[in-house]
Amino acid sequence: VVEDRVHPIVEHAGDSGNRWSFRPPSLRDPRLHVASVLLSVQVLGQVALGFELSIAQILVSLGTAAAIELLLTAPRTRVVAWPASALLSGNGVALILRVPGTEHGDWWSLHGWYVFAATAALAVLSKYVIRWGGRPLFNPSNIALVVAFLVLGSGIADPQDLWWGPMSIGLALTYTLILAGGVLITRRLHLLGVSAVFWVTFAACMAVVALAGHSMTARWNLGPVAGWQYWTTLALSPEVLIFVFFMITDPRTGARGRTAGMLYAASVAAASSVLIAFQTTEYATKVALLSGLVLVCAGRPLIEAFAPAGAGDAPRAWWSAQRGRRVVVCGVGAAALALVVVGARVANPPAPPSTAARPDVELRDDQRPDVVELGDGLATIGGSFGQDDAERVVDDVVEAVLVIDRAVETGDDELAGRVATGPFLADVVERPPSAAPDRSVDAAMVDVVRNPDEFQAQPRLEITLEGSADGVPWSSTYHVLATTADARIEREVPEV
């Protein structure tokens, strides 16, 4: 409990009922410490991590939350108190919420400002409208974000990516800040155990999901996110760590009591894991993570009734007191694990269409480019894609182009379908037969391209080849479906 000091700033003539006072922030208030960590993450996001979020959007979220809090409390109490809780809710909204189309570096963009304002307003209002036992039932920013994502959809409201970029000084500082600040603050509030139980349970469930072969698509990864990459993305994401230390540990909306707190943390981890196991896109996975907390907060009164706070609240004593308690906990845990396994096995992104084996093509030395450059866009995708990968994909694309030449010459549409897909295949099929040119390739550029009309779509590799065809200078740019091999050309970009 933080003791706040009240300082009167305005006194009206008449009785004391007309006296207004101001309650400033206290340096001992844990909410101020949480705010300092989250604001520091926001600063790093702007200067080092490339957040697609403007300063204006942050201010709209903070300002809306603070204004509504003051309008709801000041006239009734005649106390103008520093809106610490509202500012935390507004900052939580701004830290997670993104509006597609916002560009990093456009500091004062008000693009989608109304989405931030409405979500922040919903967060604060939920504290006063949805209550149980004299306190908010749901975590304000959590319930507001989930409602925004489910109602508005990915084209209007999108959660911050789980992957925050390749390891860098800025990202290392972010991890240090979240971990150090999270441990210190939750330890002071006696909630470190809640964070630990959640993370251990969640990480174990995500390991089960990954080992079951589950994967998801993400707008920052060339292929499906699977295996070790899936586990590290979910278990070690800065966004998940913020959820662990600063969202599920809200003292006002978490379960009270030592045992109830442990059950609450494990329940959130289990609920989120079950929902995640059935998702095949990063967007749905992020919403599922947040939705797990909503579901458990809705059932928080049941958890507190099952494990009431009191003298016999020690987890070991509670666990051993009644056999029925152990049966219930183990039964719920087993059911959750079974659902995690089922979801992980049955839900996966649609597999690419199978094609017949590619014909063998032997590249001449003059068809292997001497120079393969890497574009800046490759730094914005997850996984590992280096020079060797780029050279393999370029060779694969050159082979595909030669196969297309052969298919056009012979009118073999089936052959073309082995190395082409989508709009490019449709274009090739319509070409009249013509002699295959003698091509050479001198240089290549490998970069990443995204579909501006589909914000959540996976990126494509963009391969630009330069050389000659029948002795005439030739260059072309292709969008290909590929990770490190078996490239299939999806589109040929017309030269401008």
Regions found by a protein language model. Name each.
Residues 320-348:
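Internal/C-terminal transmembrane anchor helices
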Residues 152-211:
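Internal active-site segments that recognize and position negatively charged phosphoryl groups
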Residues 17-21, 45, 66-78, 122-136, ...:
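C-terminal ends of transmembrane helices
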Residues 2-76:
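N-terminal signal-anchor module of multipass membrane proteins
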Residues 75, 79-169:
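Membrane-interface helix-loop-helix junctions at boundaries between adjacent transmembrane segments
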Residues 49-64, 100-118, 160-175, 226-240:
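Structural signature of hydrophobic alpha-helical transmembrane segments
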Residues 350-355, 438-496:
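Exposed beta-sheet edge and beta->alpha loop/turn motif
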